[in-house]
Amino acid sequence: MKKFIRNNAVFIGLSLMLIAALGLALLWVPKGDLHLLLCDRHTPARDIFYRYYTQVAEWFPYVVCVALLLFSRIGDGIFATSALILSALTTQLFKHLINAPRPLTWFGANMPDVQLPLVDGVRMNYWFSFPSGHTTSFFALFFVLCIIVTNYLAPNNAGDLTAKRSNSVSGLLQALLFVLATLGAYSRIYLSQHFAADVFAGVVVGVGITICCYVLFCRFEDRKWYNYRLFKKK
C-alpha cells in the first residue's frame, strides 16, 4: 500500500486538496450562493467546451475498459471495469435513495427570482442530484488510468537518473489526469446539472471505490491470469 500511495501521490494529494476545499466551501457558503458563485462565469467558448466535454464521462470509460482488456494485461482491464462499474452502481444507489433536487428544481422552489445561466442544447435534469454520476465516472476513470500508467513508469531503482526522470514524468501525468477529471467535475456545476455537494460526493466515491478495487486486485498482480494478454507482443 505504501508503494501504491508513493506512486500515485500527486493524484491522491490533489484529490484530497479538492475534497478539503469543497468541504470547507460547503460549510461556509450557503448552497445557493455557492452554486451561483461557481457557475457565473459563462462565455460562448466555455459553453461549447463544457457542453461537449461533460459527455466524455458517458462513453470514454467504455473505450478505456475495452482497450485495456484487448491490449493491456487482462487484470488491468478487469480492475478498470470493476472500479468503473462499482463506482457507478454506488452513485446510482445513493441517487435513488436520496432523490435530491437538481439546481433547476431547487432554485425554482427556494430562490425563484434567480435565473440560472443555462447552456443551449443541454438537456436539463430535475432530480437524482446527489451524488454526481458524471463526477464519479471522471474521477474513477482518470484515477484508474493514473494507477495503471504509474505502475508501468515506477522505477526499479529510485536512486538513478532514469528513476528521477520517470518520477518527473509520472508526476506530470498524474497532474494532467487530475486536471482532466476536475474539468469534468466542474462541468456539472457550470451546466447547472449539479451542486458543489454532489460533485464533492462524486469525487469521494470515484476515488474511494477505485482504491478499494485496487486493494482487492493488487494481490493478484503476480498471477499468470492477471498478466495474460489477448494480443501478445511478438
Describe the predicted segments one by one.
Residues 1-63, 95-122:
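N-terminal transmembrane-helix/juxtamembrane module of multi-pass inner/ER membrane proteins
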Residues 3, 114-234:
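Membrane-embedded catalytic cores of phosphoryl/pyrophosphoryl-handling enzymes
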Residues 3-4, 43-51, 64, 68-72, ...:
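Membrane-helix interfacial "entry" motifs
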Residues 10-14, 75-83, 172-176, 197-201:
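Alpha-helical transmembrane segments of integral membrane proteins
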Residues 21-25, 85-93, 179-192:
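Aromatic-anchored segments of alpha-helical transmembrane domains
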Residues 35, 67-70, 91-99, 103, ...:
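Membrane-water interface at transmembrane helix exits
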Residues 54-70, 134-139, 149:
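Hydrophobic alpha-helical transmembrane segments
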Residues 66-93:
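Interfacial segments of alpha-helical transmembrane regions
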